[in-house]
Amino acid sequence: MSIRYESVENLLTLIKDKKIKPSDVVKDIYDAIEETDPTIKSFLALDKENAIKKAQELDELQAKDQMDGKLFGIPMGIKDNIITNGLETTCASKMLEGFVPIYESTVMEKLHNENAVLIGKLNMDEFAMGGSTETSYFKKTVNPFDHKAVPGGSSGGSAAAVAAGLVPFSLGSDTGGSIRQPAAYCGVVGMKPTYGRVSRFGLVAFASSLDQIGPLTRNVKDNAIVLEAISGADANDSTSAPVDDVDFTSEIGKDIKGLKVALPKEYLGEGVADDVKEAVQNAVETLKSLGAVVEEVSLPNTKFGIPSYYVIASSEASSNLSRFDGIRYGYHSKEAHSLEELYKMSRSEGFGKEVKRRIFLGTFALSSGYYDAYYKKSQKVRTLIKNDFDKVFENYDVVVGPTAPTTAFNLGEEIDDPLTMYANDLLTTPVNLAGLPGISVPCGQSNGRPIGLQFIGKPFDEKTLYRVAYQYETQYNLHDVYEKL
């Protein structure tokens, strides 16, 4: 197997045993990117000079047996809405084209401290608004499993790069499914941690009460290793939780005999494709064969997840994106002749169609005549959705269901139909609204396109999610498929 398809865990062993140098790993990764990414189009910017320099420094530490760090010498790709000091961060928008931050996000500080090596920044939907990575101002990423298909979104570049063997792990952000849905479409493992588990300091805000950073990998244990490295409270993020337990790997191999798993009837209902239902039902039988107890339950407010999510997320986005005014940073229109024109033209020209749609939607929902009818009501629905989950978790350890209602759709198929695009978030948005952890793992393929299985857990119980996902992965995975793509 080429180094490019090795797992994080195996690469760490090879480096620690001095069978390979960090600089050799980094060289192999850049060779893979040069060969494959002109087709996949997952990267927006590469940090090659700094990566090679860092890898050579790690070579010297390796020679001295000073290999500190949980991710010593491991290459990584980072979604382009996560601030990287000295490296362009654009959110895939014309508005931030050429913007180079002068500070580091907390997750990047943590990863640098663990001696991971930054390879580059990954494509995404503009400002994380979209489900296909087609709203990017710069390029359209394709699905490594089928180049006619979308990789999902908004973390499409993060999922595609991992599936294509261009990095062993990446970071994405998940506001309504933006890690889990592309993970499902691209056949990789994607974790959306509990809200507050990972610091959001340095994540360009979309919807602050929903956003969460998480890892994408080709296997479950790698995912747990990366989440251990980036978790923890942060004084710079008042919403980060002071939870000390960040051990996700010690019990990962423990069996799931007697584990109580809930299967909501709504998750296999209207709107979910037959091939997805079949794959999930097969996965449920696999869980039973592993000793889990799977029972049907109801999450009655699931159907209200999409409307309440889009009102809340768009409302928060309209506020968060007001900072892009053409004055302090970002795109600045040269044609404006007054302050009002500068605001109007900079924002009209700098933002794409989908971002403007959500700003309008959010501004409308927050306006004085409609606040109670839309925003306030959506927050009440959010509470009902959370209560549904709380009730189920009184008797069950984990909830299971599809990650997305279909496999990846074709490029260009849904980009001009926002309601159809939004409907793809049916099974992921409730998890964000409730602030819960959710992980997507591959559970099948249909016409060559992967199908994702989602496990949802109690707050801060990522450990159980990793345990059940790891056991399921022993029975079904795509580990032998990636290299053939």
From Swiss-Prot:
GO terms for molecular function: ATP binding; glutaminyl-tRNA synthase (glutamine-hydrolyzing) activity. It holds the Pfam family Amidase. One of its GO terms (cellular component) is glutamyl-tRNA(Gln) amidotransferase complex. It is an enzyme of class 6 (ligase). The active site is at K79, S154, S178. It catalyses: L-glutamyl-tRNA(Gln) + L-glutamine + ATP + H2O = L-glutaminyl-tRNA(Gln) + L-glutamate + ADP + phosphate + H(+). Transmembrane segments: none annotated. GO terms for biological process: translation. Keywords: ATP-binding, Ligase, Nucleotide-binding, Protein biosynthesis. Its EC number is 6.3.5.7. Coiled coil: none annotated. Heterotrimer of A, B and C subunits. Belongs to the amidase family. GatA subfamily. Allows the formation of correctly charged Gln-tRNA(Gln) through the transamidation of misacylated Glu-tRNA(Gln) in organisms which lack glutaminyl-tRNA synthetase. The reaction takes place in the presence of glutamine and ATP through an activated gamma-phospho-Glu-tRNA(Gln). This is Glutamyl-tRNA(Gln) amidotransferase subunit A. It comes from Staphylococcus aureus (strain MRSA252). The gene is gatA.
